[in-house]
């Protein structure tokens, strides 16, 4: 299981952060779990009014993330699912999404939580979606990582806090 060795992140004083969640629509059951996990994590962190936007698929996540990064968000969470099929499409989409979201983060300085599952099978995706019986909750993890990074960046840019 890939979740072994995950850090326990302590995130405090982040209720005032402006956070957006962007979620793809492919693989509805998996996406419902990822979105629920993300919203639960935000609520646990005291961020009760996040922006939630839906896009057609994972490939559309980077362009929306880039626009949101330029509109004053402190953190963005990108959620999607890409499941391997019988053609190279999986590799192209997975690489494009990964590089695109990384570029948004590096270019803008706004953390983007990477909650895009790239799996060989639907069963692997369901096991990571945070649903009842899942072993992992990648939506929750992506929020925690993005918000923790935003909180860290706040201390770097505002040392008086």
From Swiss-Prot:
GO CC annotation, single: riboflavin synthase complex
Pfam families with a match to the protein in the record: DMRL_synthase
This protein's pathway: Cofactor biosynthesis; riboflavin biosynthesis; riboflavin from 2-hydroxy-3-oxobutyl phosphate and 5-amino-6-(D-ribitylamino)uracil: step 1/2
Binding, (2S)-2-hydroxy-3-oxobutyl phosphate: 86-87, 128
Primary enzyme class: transferase
Classification via HAMAP family: Lumazine_synth
UniProt name for this protein: 6,7-dimethyl-8-ribityllumazine synthase
